[in-house]
UniProtKB/Swiss-Prot annotation:
Function summary: Core component of the dynactin complex which assists cytoplasmic dynein by increasing its processivity and by regulation of its cargo binding. The dynactin complex is required for the spindle translocation late in anaphase and is involved in a cell wall synthesis checkpoint. ARP1 forms the backbone filament of the dynactin rod structure and serves as the scaffold for the remaining subunits. Required for proper orientation of the mitotic spindle.
Protein name per Swiss-Prot or TrEMBL: Centractin
Effect of substituting D6A: Temperature-sensitive
Assigned protein family: Belongs to the actin family. ARP1 subfamily.
Keyword RNA-binding carried by entry: no
Gene that this sequence comes from: ARP1
Amino acid sequence: MDQLSDSYALYNQPVVIDNGSGIIKAGFSGEERPKALEYCLVGNTKYDKVMLEGLQGDTFIGNNAQKLRGLLKLRYPIKHGVVEDWDSMELIWSYVLNEVLQLQNIGEHPLLITEAPMNPLKNREQMAQVLFETFDVSALYVSNPAVLSLYASGRTTGCVVDCGEGYCSTVPIYDGFALPASMMRMDIGGADITEQLQFQLRKSAGVSLFSSSEREIVRTMKEKVCYLAKNIKKEEEKYLQGTQDLISTFKLPDGRCIEVGNDRYRAPEILFSPQIIGLGYDGLSDMCMQSIWKVDLDLRKPLLSSIILSGGTTTLKGFGDRMLWDLEALTKGTSKIKIIAPSERKYTTWIGGSILTGLSTFQRLWTKKSDWLEDSTRVYSNLM
């Protein structure tokens, strides 16, 4: 594949997009943090307008839709890491690129974008087609988010545990080489915790918050009060004994306050015990161990001592402690296990993309639009 010229790379700063199910992060190569942090949602007004003044338009995108959620019916284009609503996805990309990043011509910039590991090839094909044809990007690279998170950590070896809004994955990488046969994924993430909390609140507190706008309220509640218990059985015993520090109060937008008790740790427990919601996955700790056990025997020790957390869901209180507790139990104390939890792990995927696209050695990896036009099938297989 032809390299982009040095002048091309110099005068056309690459754009980096971490295309998350919950929040889309976007910005320019070489910068320390993303310039755009927008909720990945689109909202349409659900009421008839009766006055000329007030809000203009009937479609709102990203953070604007989040702010006006009470007036809107919200749509989430990405479900479990897969784009299901391409029209809404295009609206979000257009808004982020043109309005937030204020790009005059996206076609003059190479674009790195993330895609969940083990996604259907059809999703990547559609993504490439939309970005090349609709947005006219000049060059494209589609990356595994876990690989970028490892770049951001400054390491070349580690098992990346990436948990976002739509899915969780475990990706072992050794000395810069991804080990695809050992990658694992489960389609449970932060959105499922939010949904579980919705059901539990109705059952335990009689609070019904099920509209698309109310779902965002519950998402905020999850982020503020939920946590992972290190030992779920002991936590249940403490709760039954009436321990008051396990109860948290959350204020709803209408001023009502509700007490959240054992739902605080029961809702996120689905990550580690998916059978709670009737799914057959083994749980995140088991999945991490299975990924590492799939690699060659000689590679396991350095992977166990470099387990890197990435994604917004890993910022739940107690997440790292729970992973360590479970993995030490699974290895029966025979291996040294180290959990690495970067303080900015919500953004480490984007930061890794910013670093990667700035390397001179990366320039040969871009897929140019001319290559895609010549042989799109071959190019799809290169967008990894």
